[in-house]
Amino acid sequence: MSEKKEEVKNATVKVTVKLPKEDNHSHNTKHLKKTQSSKNNDISFEIGKESKIQTVLDVLAMIPSSKYLTNVGLKTIEGDSQLSDEMSIKEIVGEKSELKLQLILKPYSAREALKHVITVRDFIGFAQETSDGLSEFAISTGSSFSSLPLGPIKERSKQEEKDEKSDPEEKKNTFKDVTDEEKLKFNEMVHEVFSSFKNSSINKLLTSESNIITPCVRSLSFAPYNPVPPFYRSKGHLFYLQIVTLEGESFYITAIPSGFYVNKSNSTKFDPSPKENTDENAHSSLIYYSLFDLIASRSKKFISHVQAFEKKLSALDSTSYVRPSNTFLHKPWFVSSLPPNNPDYLRLQTAALDTTPERNFNDEFQAIKDLTTSTLQDRIEMERLFSKVVHEFSVTAASGAMSIFYSDFVAMNPESPTRDQIFLKDNIFYSYVSDVSGNYEGKGGDEAAIAASNQDLKTINILNRLHMHEVRYLLTTVVEFAGRRILAQTPVPGLLATMGNKIVKDANTGEEVTEDFVNDINVKYGLDEGLGKIVYDADFDSVLEKKFVKAFHLKKHKVNGTELAFSSQSKGIVGFDKRRYILDLANTYPLDINFARQNFDNIEETGNRYPHRQTLLRPELVEKWWNNKVEKEGVEFEKAYEENLFSYNPDAYQVEGIEDANVDEMSNYLQKEVIPSVIQDYLSGNLSTPYNGEHLADTLHKNGINMRYLGKIIELSQKELDSQIVHYEQNLKAVEQDNKEYEDWEKSYLQKIENMIKERQAKINKLVQEGKEVPKELTEDLKLNDEEIKKPTDGKPVVVAYDELVPLIKISELEIVSRSLKHVLKDLSKDVPVFLVPSLVAYVFNMLVGINYNADPKPEPVDEFYPVNKCSFAKLTRSELLEAVSKQAFLRFRHQLPSNWIEAYMENPFTLIRSVSYKFGIQLLNKEYFFTREQLESYKQSLDKKIRNKFVEPPTTFSLSDLTIIPRVKFSEYTSSVSEEFWAQGASMINEDKQSALTLLAQSITVLEDVNNILHPAVAEKYLSLSAIYNKLALYPEAIAFCRKACTIYERVSGIDSFEMMRALTNLAILEFSNESPYNATVVYNRLAEILKVYELPKIHHPAPTSIFNHLEQLALGVQDTKLAIEVLGQLSSYVVELEGKDSLAYGYTESRLGNLFAALKDFHRALEHITVTQGIFTKQLGMNHTHSAQSRQWVNGLSSLIMDLKQKKQLAQDQMSTTGSNSAGHKKTNHRQKKDDVKPELANKSVDELLTFIEGDSSNSKSKNKTNNKKKHGKK
């Protein structure tokens, strides 16, 4: 790692690039001003010596003065020849620290001119930020985070930092640098949060902003006069364009090697010759090297729009509008509106004119893996290309799969049934995921094959990180659409090729027949399905042993006498390119044998079995178990890895007669240790309470738990909850008994003290009567036995972990229901024509949750060629649908849903619909949906009278016109190992060398952005982590900037309502709090409140709402607005009462805090009201002798006395007004003595606490502040 650190500090070179002089290639006209594409100046920047010339060109492609020059090269100032793009800077400069280069304009070819046109289009607003590789099949929405009314990040002054260090306690309590204007805005925003918790709607939350990027011309496309006629093609004409400016002018352009010019063509006449410019300011040359300059010369509005456009972008973080290159944008389930499908011929035309040769993704992928990685720059370049080709394969595969789903491809075997058909296009092999070969017969058939395709992809994800050169694998993507699933893979080179054929005579008939030559590309190692046996190859075996076996902890074993290093279902093939490929890697992981036995093997009735036996353990579980074994056995990690200790046999319990104790142990480890420990982690707060099903799945998967254990999660969580409730109720009874005992003890102890006092007084009286001196011991305090006194206890309250367990149970149930419903939809739709699936989905949704609006919904017709009423789903009844969901819930999750399970989702159906939509692939239109007739009538009354009269009532809640079906793409993932290494080193040295550590962390993110592009989930995760590190270092402004960037990325790639976004928003709010920006923090809390409300998380006891209220109270106190803090606690108190009632400890704690705040305002009557409430709660829940109960009594007594004292003083002041000054003074004196006498009631009537105070002379606690233990969250009882 020290070498890497040196490479980070590698010397940079100052590069100066001289742009071309003004001539016909660059028109420095008045109208171009600052937006001209190239100026007669130099561009300078720093770049690493290890960088290549291509990197310099990449930088120039983003600089305003050169970004419109796309067909260029570079040469040194002294040299004549163009430098190779792959040449490194170091090769050119040697030991020098400066490099001067000249930009060379190259003549256009049709290909380069097309590239230039597309680049210009992108820069002038045709490349919308909502487009990605799936835009043809699904809708993405823009960012709304950038429209949040957040103020600028507050910079901390050195004096503030100094004050914070010198007086951290003061810093914690109050904010020093908050203006009156911000306080006012903060107050208003707090009230918006209150409103959001009550009135937020799904329609408002998921209304996306209009696109940030909009075109600066009306249209730019190829003219209908293409292709170029032969007469002009030979004269250099490349193609013709047609442009319509914002002024409405339409003109035609000819592209030639030296650039572009306006020609004489119009809509009815073709004349590609140059059109003379009659403008007085016209230039001598009519040819523009840059298309941008040509448009600018013809349109004044174009320049102003480009300036406004660039100004708008400059005000935003680039993450809010940059297009993704290595990932897909989030596809929300609720889309604001259908995207405008404006005429843009170029979208279709570019495909026709594209001269790029057909890609061979496998060749590209394998060539990238062969690249040299001797230097850091080489490694980064390899990873960048790797990530790029993996994503581009997924895009192409998804597009190809969709063509198959829509029957636009012809199969290689068209006569076969649909599920057996295979396809080959663009060197990608497609097949429906089913058990065509019969490998999973007896194990679940198609269901097992579907599970195996997911498991195969998991293996490939791990292989992506291993960088094995001697073992190769295939690019793989899985596409699901409308209940169907297609597997797309790059084929092994030569495997599908025909080796030619020969004509031979049939031995029986004598007829001549054609016979194919045998393909010599076949299985060398593992399962040969053609031969029906396991084959062995020593070379293949030795290669697998080097890294593959160790990485997966596989044990070498024998199957039918043949030795194998991996599963007997996997294959090893030597391709035509002589590389070794491994395929069918699903069974690389061990079987979860306990689950298989319990839910498949030992279930005699097939209908109650788990759908398949392909129940493998997750890779995270295997790693967790292996690391646990290494630690328990006390073996060094390196030794365990190199010697392949604690390995397992992947064929154990898969092949008859093969067993493995480690496989049994892993299965036991999952069920008996991991699952219970995860529930305990939720209880202890080590794991965040899930926001939604995706959050839960992410947490379970990271801990190695399969989703088939959701039923087990609910079972254990409910058992824990029931146990806690029983314990809580038992404790209440015990407290009640303790209170009785305490009252009895108090009464007897008071009586004892009174007797002691009487005895002492009798002795004193006797001595006085006898005229004797009273001994000192009779005038001193009573000597009491401390052991007899029951002092207040501070025992831990017995609470029920509702906050942790109820959301876990409810979200697990929601996930079971939505996943079960997804399987029902898949079963219903897999044999239905694709075009009918929207009708099917609308029908199912109407039956599920629209029954109170229309009790008898019917499926809508789509096309007369596909009559809906003849489909099986049209005969489905609601009871059958509900029963089908319940059956899937039991089969797949071993969980029995209650008979009325649907009722839980009828009040807010969108919670269920959202979850199902993400899983099946559904996008709904953002509009008003009516689930009851009352909702409809209410909506109609809210309309303007004119609109109401024209309003047409929808026949059902959902219509097929409200939704679309979209593909769900499962693709292999890749992350940069170089970035991870920089991050690990930076994180490890943060305490020793902060500056170097932060530099390494920043370098890690820079590398990751280079490899994956800035718009990527992995980049967002790193920014969020970096934000947390800066927060720990008290560098709050920087932490906020990083966290805001993470929020923007997460919103675009994960969604506004994703758990990643909610987690990032929560962090951001806390950071804004730490930076003393109460308004900004509250803006973020308001967005969180909206999300929490629309998905009804407050109703399932989620702790997030309470956390928000608690932070809002602290913010209010920070700006010293006690009245606002009281309002916040009032809202919290109402929320707690709604969830738990007025007997809960949470309510008592909140009332106690309210009492304190009212006391601070000197509103002692209100303070007494709230503190009095706590006395009964604490006594019932904690016991009379608990510290909180004792303090509450002291508060009540103290406040009561204080109120009485103030009342007496007020009365005294009134009396003084009616008397003379002297009498007043005398009266006051008498009254004061009277008060002293009055506040000493009979000792027998005092409580033990009061009595002790009296005897011991300790009055310091009479106004003790009730500091309640507020560590427990609101969900505790």
UniProtKB/Swiss-Prot annotation:
Q: What is its main location?
A: cytoplasm
The record's note on what follows loss of this gene reads: Causes mitochondria to cluster within cells.
For this chain's UniProt record, which GO biological process terms are given?
Answer: intracellular distribution of mitochondria; mitochondrion organization
Q: What family does this belong to? A: Belongs to the CLU family.
Keyword Cytoplasm listed: yes
Locations listed in the record? Cytoplasm
Sites of the modification Phosphoserine? Answer: 1247
> May I have one GO cellular component term?
cytoplasmic stress granule
Q: Which PROSITE patterns match?
A: CLU
Subunit and interaction comment: May associate with the eukaryotic translation initiation factor 3 (eIF-3) complex. Associates with the 80S ribosome.
Q: What induces it?
A: Expression is increased in intermediate compared to fully aerobic conditions.
Q: Which gene encodes it?
A: CLU1
* Gene3D superfamilies listed in its UniProt record: Tetratricopeptide repeat domain
As a miscellaneous remark, the entry gives:
Present with 17000 molecules/cell in log phase SD medium.
Q: What is this protein called?
A: Clustered mitochondria protein 1
Composition skew (Basic and acidic residues), residue ranges: 153-176, 1235-1249
The Basic residues compositionally biased stretches are: 27-36, 1264-1277
Q: Does the keyword Oxidoreductase apply?
A: no
Q: What are the entry keywords?
A: Cytoplasm, Phosphoprotein, Repeat, TPR repeat
> Mind listing the GO molecular function terms for this protein?
mRNA binding; RNA binding
UniProt repeat feature TPR, residue ranges: 704-738, 1020-1053, 1148-1181
